[in-house]
Amino acid sequence: MSTKQSFKIAGVDGCKGGWLVAIVEVKGKRHSFELTCMPPPITNFSDVLWATKGCKVVCIDIPIGLSDRDRWRCDQKAKEILGNRQCCVFFAPIRPILSYKRYPAANRTSRCLSGHGLSIQSFNIMDKIHQVDSVMTPNKQKRFREVHPEVCFWALNHGQPMQRKKTTDAGRKDRMRVLAPIFQNLRGIVTKDNRAKGVKVDDILDALVAAYTAGQVVLDNYSTLPARPQRDGKGLRMEILCPAACDPKFGVLKPPHLSC
């Protein structure tokens, strides 16, 4: 997908009130990144599809591709990479429980079918996972790709996890330090006056690092977790993307046509 022309990409993060969408334009031969639009949170994922229709790639912080029974997914690889910060990654729910509305029943069924319980954190975002899964197809997945912001920050931070929580002042500063060389006026973007109601600074930073990763996908400068993803029962790849990294220890590789 490499290109020398300007193009638009997007990063999407789940937040209070729905989905936060950061639409970014990548300009010129030097590939500068400029935030062009960040509307108030969008309630339904179907509207996210419409809002990002002009974007080449959209990276989303939500599981895409789900197992029906086992923990086939990429979550374990992400945990291994993040080491002592692996608590940031939650195992995705199995597809048969997506419509469950009560945690005890979802947890019980998950344990029965997969041998593993369901974390309360995963249950709390299960409605969003269901929204995405209900519309996602292998063809749509060519443009809509899964990321985990902490894995993206790991890649941008020279293979070192962010050690401080994103909800703390110190953690936000750590992540802004990584993103500041990429996005001009980052401080202005995250100021309270420029944030929609209910949107937190860490929501914006997660959406921006997802958007940056989308740009790297267009430029063929990205990695996948695992290096050779499996497909689920719908034919969706179970993978997490991040900016290019090369760490055979964890099975993180550039695409096959790029050398490490």
Functional labels for PLM-detected ranges:
Residues 2-260:
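Phosphate- and other anionic-substrate recognition elements at nucleic-acid/protein interfaces
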